[in-house]
Amino acid sequence: PPRSTLDRSSAASDVYKRQSEVKRLIADPRSWHFVRSFCDQWLKVYRHHEMQVDVTEHPSFTRFVKNDLAEETYHFTRHVMQNNMSIFTLIDSDFVMINQNLAEFYGIPGVQGTDFQVIPVSPEMKRGGLITQGSFLSGHSDGNQGHPIKRAVWLMERILGESPPPPPPNVPDLDPKDPVNQQLSIAQQLAIHRDSVSCRNCHKKLDPYGLVFEEYNGAGLLNPPTTSAQDTKVTLPTGGIVNGVAEMKDYIVQSRSREFRTSLVKHLLTYALGRDMSFADEKDIKNIVETLSAKGDRFQTLVETLVTSPLFLR
């Protein structure tokens, strides 16, 4: 949406006017441009668009489903923003934003129509929040099965704000066509990788954040219940143990809340300023993070605090 009024308010250094303008801009239908472009940059939704899911293996993954999976992410994020929900709703929510097409894809009953709508979900459905959405899960797969390393890197970079270690040179990817690998689960294959001295340190940090997603296949659907529960039970680099995505959500919200809060602030600043954050920005970032936390972690508070910060006004 146009920033002219916001810019004039900024020039006047009028905090109240800027905050009011934020509310107006968020309510404006043209805020869709912000939501889509920010989600594309922050969450790397483009990877979902680029991924060629094997439709012979996943016949329900039609081109209409593929399009709606990206729309789900946009609608969900916009709903959280416009309703001024907690930023932690982005991690875990008791609802999804879907239409009939996606409801049939996910296996969620009772949804009709093409419009995206708020649909309550129970824990047994294993949905809710960004990290169980098909756009992320399919976009970070190999088109058939889930890809734990891609998913781990995304979670560390986009959600926790960590920089994963780069792989050592000349280390081949896991080959799904290898007869030996075909007899092993992904968790077992990665365990073999960890036995290699050159791979051990990287995989010890990465694997736990990816293996929790082994409940979901390359299309973003739940794997059959026959999938070993042990594949999703992991020991985190911090020493804690989580089993599956539900416990990973709890871990992020309860134990890594500051990391997620800081990561989201940095990603939004990067988008708003059109540049990466640097060491010189750390003091201002810390102030935004502390203000956001003190005011209840509401999404609109995040935007208001950002646009009244020295970083934005310089």
Where are these regions (language model features)?
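N-terminal alpha-helical segment
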Residues: 8, 18, 73, 265, ...
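Short, surface-exposed glycine/acidic/tryptophan-bearing loops
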Residues: 35, 55-56, 260, 264, ...
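A cross-family structural signal marking well-folded subdomains
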Residues: 13, 17-154, 165
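Sequence context surrounding c-type heme c attachment/ligation sites in exported
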Residues: 100-103, 118-261, 272, 279, ...
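Structured segments of extracytoplasmic/periplasmic soluble domains
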Residues: 10-13, 24-29, 41-45, 76-83, ...
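Single conserved hydrophobic/aromatic residue that forms the stacking wall/gate
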Residues: 1-12, 16
